[in-house]
């Protein structure tokens, strides 16, 4: 006589959590941090079409790691929810906290009720409306629906421990944009699995900001020459090193 296979609820939750954590850890890292004029998103992402960072609404941004199809569905659903709320009520009624709570409820339901949890981790950020003075809000939402507000920065995906340790040492409140980009990129470069420090350039970075000084839509991507201009020393050092390598020994 064969007995039906039984697994305790505790073991089932542990296995779901392990599956989700492993999937998230395989992804490349994303950093979101508050700076003087809003929120900066920096993602290690060589793809120009599969984006990890996007706008959700006028003053709200989104970043994610994990399975692209899963977090892209969540991103699209969040945009539809925000548009519906803004149309039915007021655009100012759509907040980052509201969207973070919706994502937390959705991921919590998926984690407990569906056969497989989503292998994703999300960040929802909001800046103050134009002319208002309010600190940026950063929310981290994990695969099981847990939600936490972070005062300064959020690190997701990949090897997060060295990146967090680097940011704990180097993060500065109210930094200018160029300084904030340097801090975030330096932290991402410390997150490799190997012993050697990696070098990340414009071709491997996805960078965007929520700029509180913009009148309505705060989200703006930084690409091409604008991104290169934020990393002048890095480019100059690379050119100097290349020139030294090409120069024959005397």
From Swiss-Prot:
InterPro entries: Ntn_hydrolases_N, Proteasome_alpha, Proteasome_alpha-type, Proteasome_asu_bac, Proteasome_sua/b. Pathway: Protein degradation; proteasomal Pup-dependent pathway. GO terms for biological process: modification-dependent protein catabolic process; proteasomal protein catabolic process. One of its GO terms (cellular component) is cytoplasm. Keywords: Cytoplasm, Proteasome. GO terms for molecular function: threonine-type endopeptidase activity. The formation of the proteasomal ATPase ARC-20S proteasome complex, likely via the docking of the C-termini of ARC into the intersubunit pockets in the alpha-rings, may trigger opening of the gate for substrate entry. Interconversion between the open-gate and close-gate conformations leads to a dynamic regulation of the 20S proteasome proteolysis activity. Gene3D superfamilies: Glutamine Phosphoribosylpyrophosphate, subunit 1, domain 1 (3.60.20.10). The 20S proteasome core is composed of 14 alpha and 14 beta subunits that assemble into four stacked heptameric rings, resulting in a barrel-shaped structure. The two inner rings, each composed of seven catalytic beta subunits, are sandwiched by two outer rings, each composed of seven alpha subunits. The catalytic chamber with the active sites is on the inside of the barrel. Has a gated structure, the ends of the cylinder being occluded by the N-termini of the alpha-subunits. Is capped by the proteasome-associated ATPase, ARC. Component of the proteasome core, a large protease complex with broad specificity involved in protein degradation. This is Proteasome subunit alpha. It comes from Mycobacterium sp. (strain KMS).
């Amino acid at each position: 006589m064969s007995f039906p296979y039984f697994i305790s609820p505790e073991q089932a939750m542990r296995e779901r959590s392990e599956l989700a954590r492993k999937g998230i850890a395989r992804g490349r890292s994303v950093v979101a941090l508050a700076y003087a004029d809003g929120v900066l998103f920096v993602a290690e992402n060589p793809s120009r079409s599969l984006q990890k960072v996007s706008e959700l609404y006028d003053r709200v941004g989104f970043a994610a790691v994990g399975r692209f199809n899963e977090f892209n569905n969540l991103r699209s659903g969040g945009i539809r929810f925000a548009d519906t709320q803004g149309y039915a009520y007021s655009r100012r009624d759509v907040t980052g906290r509201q969207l973070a709570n919706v994502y937390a409820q959705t991921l919590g339901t998926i984690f407990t009720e569906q056969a497989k949890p989503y292998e994703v981790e999300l960040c929802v950020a909001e800046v103050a409306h134009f002319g208002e003075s309010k600190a940026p809000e950063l929310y981290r939402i994990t695969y099981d629906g847990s939600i936490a507000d972070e005062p300064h920065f959020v690190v997701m995906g990949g090897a997060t421990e060295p990146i967090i340790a680097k940011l704990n040492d180097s993060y500065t409140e109210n930094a200018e944009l160029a300084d904030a980009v340097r801090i975030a990129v330096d932290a991402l470069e410390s997150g490799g699995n190997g012993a050697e420090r990696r070098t990340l350039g414009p071709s491997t970075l996805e960078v965007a900001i929520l700029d509180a000084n913009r009148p309505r839509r705060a989200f703006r991507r930084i690409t091409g020459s604008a991104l290169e201009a934020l990393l002048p020393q890095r480019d100059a050092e690379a050119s100097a090193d290349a020139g030294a390598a090409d120069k024959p020994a005397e």
